[in-house]
């Protein structure tokens, strides 16, 4: 399982060479090592960022990628390397395009953290959260346990292994404002968010078509957003 990466779109925009070294060269290094060691299969954590701001929804795996950041471009390059290593060297490969993964133990103070963990960290600190943009941008959040399910299925399935690309999500979208209201409802917070200019490379709307992964891997998301948020904000 190749899960390591520079995962911040904003950092990739500021440091494209670092992104290239980690997300492109790093993936190539993993594939080379797997080939040398006789590893049968490599499963890559790719990203929905490869779709870019194409307004068509939901995002399907056969859509033309339109990367808007070095991060997205690096993930797309990794997918192509997987296909090449499968076809040229016989290494079985699968790329999973993660949408917005969330779950307990994400560090809300980290620059690499997702919006949910940052919101929760703000609530705990009594600090007004910052929303980049108008808050109407949408995301398709998927709980980490469902991502684990997808990875295990991708590693074990005989239906994949030739560089296939599969979306990993719930197939439901929610705006950041709706997300904030959901967290307020769970925690009782009275904080009001502040708004800043949208960041370069950020995606406006995101929603996955998960029919392919359901058909090919029998993937079925088990955990809804309410459950996941409850797991994050629960004491301890």
Task: For each feature predicted by the language model, list its residue ranges.
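Hydrophobic alpha-helix immediately C-terminal to the catalytic Tyr-X-X-X-Lys motif of short-chain
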Residues: 77, 81, 85, 115, ...
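C-terminal substrate-binding subdomain of Rossmann-fold SDR/epimerase-dehydratase oxidoreductases
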Residues: 123-236
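A generic structural signal for well-ordered alpha-helical segments
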Residues: 34, 86, 122-123, 184
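Short secondary-structure boundary/capping segments
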Residues: 10, 56, 120-121, 157-158
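Short beta-strand->alpha-helix junction loop in the catalytic core
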Residues: 103-105
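Conserved catalytic loops of nucleotide-sugar-dependent glycosyltransferases that act on lipid-linked
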Residues: 108-115
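N-terminal Rossmann-like NAD(P)+-binding domain of SDR-like oxidoreductases, especially those catalyzing
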Residues: 1-101, 145, 219, 223
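Conserved donor sugar-nucleotide recognition element shared by glycan-biosynthetic enzymes
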Residues: 70, 78, 112, 176, ...
């Amino acid at each position: 399982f190749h899960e390591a990466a520079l995962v911040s779109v904003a950092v990739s925009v500021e440091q494209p060479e670092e992104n290239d070294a980690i997300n492109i060269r790093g993936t190539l290094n993993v594939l080379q090592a797997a080939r040398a060691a006789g590893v049968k299969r490599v499963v890559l954590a790719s990203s929905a960022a490869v779709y870019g701001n194409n307004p068509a929804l939901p995002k399907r795996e056969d859509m033309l990628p339109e990367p808007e950041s070095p991060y997205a471009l690096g993930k797309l390059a990794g997918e192509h390397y997987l296909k090449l290593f499968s076809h040229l060297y016989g290494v079985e490969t699968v790329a999973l395009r993660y949408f917005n993964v969330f779950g307990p133990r994400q560090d809300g103070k980290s620059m690499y953290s997702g919006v949910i963990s940052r919101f929760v960290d703000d609530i705990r600190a009594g600090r007004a959260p910052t929303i980049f943009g108008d808050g109407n941008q949408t995301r398709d959040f998927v709980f980490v346990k469902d991502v684990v399910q997808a990875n295990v299925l991708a590693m074990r399935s005989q239906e994949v292994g030739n560089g296939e690309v599969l979306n990993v999500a719930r197939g439901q979208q929610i705006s950041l404002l709706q997300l904030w209201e959901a967290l307020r409802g769970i925690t009782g917070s009275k904080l009001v968010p502040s708004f800043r200019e949208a960041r370069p490379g950020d995606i406006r709307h995101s929603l996955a078509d998960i029919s392919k992964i359901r058909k090919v891997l029998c993937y079925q998301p088990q955990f809804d957003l309410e459950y996941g948020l409850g797991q994050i904000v629960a004491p301890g």
